[in-house]
């Protein structure tokens, strides 16, 4: 691990490069509802942004709530989300998550990381994204690329 002086140096450099950066809670949501934000994040896993956007548009035209989603067949969901890839696993997770939201969370997206990660298809990174951009909590989504950079800087252990 590097010492605090190294971290402070990097922070000051980045702050000078990005003077308008704000650490305030974000106001905008990814989509208009927490549910569609959650499903959008689930669809984004291992997918390009363009393909995720197409899949979201197609899926949310059919269903944009857990109540509506569980009325779709897995095949209907697969056809809608096909552009995002991994459509078999994602469709199963979307249906299972929608059912779980209705059965265990009164149809609402939970606002704790532990509860989010109990949903099928939601891991640490996805839950961090939802916590940050849906609920405005100070979470940072760390993917393999961010972790690799932090490891090379000596700020993270393998």
Say what each PLM segment does.
Residues 2-158:
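Catalytic cores of DNA base-excision repair glycosylases
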């Amino acid at each position: 691990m590097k010492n605090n002086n190294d971290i402070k140096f990097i922070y000051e450099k980045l702050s000078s490069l990005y003077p308008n950066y704000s650490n305030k809670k974000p106001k905008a949501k990814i989509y208009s509802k927490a549910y569609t934000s959650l499903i959008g994040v689930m669809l984004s896993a291992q997918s390009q942004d363009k393909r995720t956007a197409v899949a979201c548009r197609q899926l949310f035209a059919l269903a944009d709530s857990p109540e509506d989603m569980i009325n779709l067949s897995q095949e209907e969901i697969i056809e809608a989300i096909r552009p995002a890839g991994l459509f078999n696993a994602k469709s199963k997770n979307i249906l299972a998550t929608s059912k779980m939201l209705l059965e265990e969370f009164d149809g609402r997206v939970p606002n704790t990381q532990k509860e989010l990660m109990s949903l099928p298809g939601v891991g640490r990174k996805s839950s961090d994204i939802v916590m940050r951009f849906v609920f405005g909590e100070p979470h940072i989504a760390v993917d393999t690329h961010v972790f690799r950079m932090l490891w090379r800087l000596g700020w993270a252990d393998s």
